[in-house]
From Swiss-Prot:
<dbReference type="Pfam" id="PF03669">
    <property type="entry name" value="ASTER"/>
</dbReference>
<dbReference type="InterPro" id="IPR005351">
    <property type="entry name" value="ASTER"/>
</dbReference>
<feature type="region of interest" description="Disordered">
    <location>
        <begin position="1"/>
        <end position="25"/>
    </location>
</feature>
<dbReference type="GO" id="GO:0005789">
    <property type="term" value="C:endoplasmic reticulum membrane"/>
</dbReference>
<dbReference type="GO" id="GO:0044183">
    <property type="term" value="F:protein folding chaperone"/>
</dbReference>
<keyword id="KW-1133">Transmembrane helix</keyword>
<comment type="similarity">
    <text>Belongs to the Asterix family.</text>
</comment>
<protein>
    <recommendedName>
        <fullName>Protein Asterix</fullName>
    </recommendedName>
</protein>
<dbReference type="GO" id="GO:0045048">
    <property type="term" value="P:protein insertion into ER membrane"/>
</dbReference>
<feature type="compositionally biased region" description="Polar residues">
    <location>
        <begin position="1"/>
        <end position="15"/>
    </location>
</feature>
<keyword id="KW-0812">Transmembrane</keyword>
<keyword id="KW-0472">Membrane</keyword>
<feature type="transmembrane region" description="Helical">
    <location>
        <begin position="82"/>
        <end position="98"/>
    </location>
</feature>
Length: 107
């Protein structure tokens, strides 16, 4: 028994390759895009890093900024949010590492 892989199998192909069309995504308005959670988390962590002087929050804010930058969909709005989060994160790191030390808690 031999199987033929010639033109007969391509004619009987149930997938119909001649009817295939490339996928073209529909344009989505910037207001309808989903929320950029990593950018929002980066802003929150950056602000808490500056206000409460937590180094880990500032470092995590930089990581979330990088993630948000990699997944950026809307250039104008997302870039504003990422730049603000990055500014807070860098400001928190500068004040933590170069600023005056925190007063020690008395026991």
């Amino acid at each position: 028994m031999s199987h033929s892989h010639g033109n007969a199998s391509s004619v009987n192909d149930p997938r119909q390759p001649s009817a295939a069309k490339p996928y073209i995504p529909r344009p989505v308005a910037p207001e309808d895009l989903p929320v950029d959670y990593s950018g929002f988390i980066a802003v929150i962590l950056g602000v808490s890093g500056v206000m409460f002087r937590y180094k880990i929050c500032s470092w995590l804010a930089i990581i979330f900024c990088a993630q948000s930058l990699a997944n950026m969909r809307n250039l104008e709005n997302d870039l504003k949010q990422i730049s603000m989060a990055m500014m807070f994160a860098i400001m928190g790191l500068v004040t933590n590492y170069l600023g005056p030390n925190r007063p020690a808690t008395k026991k």
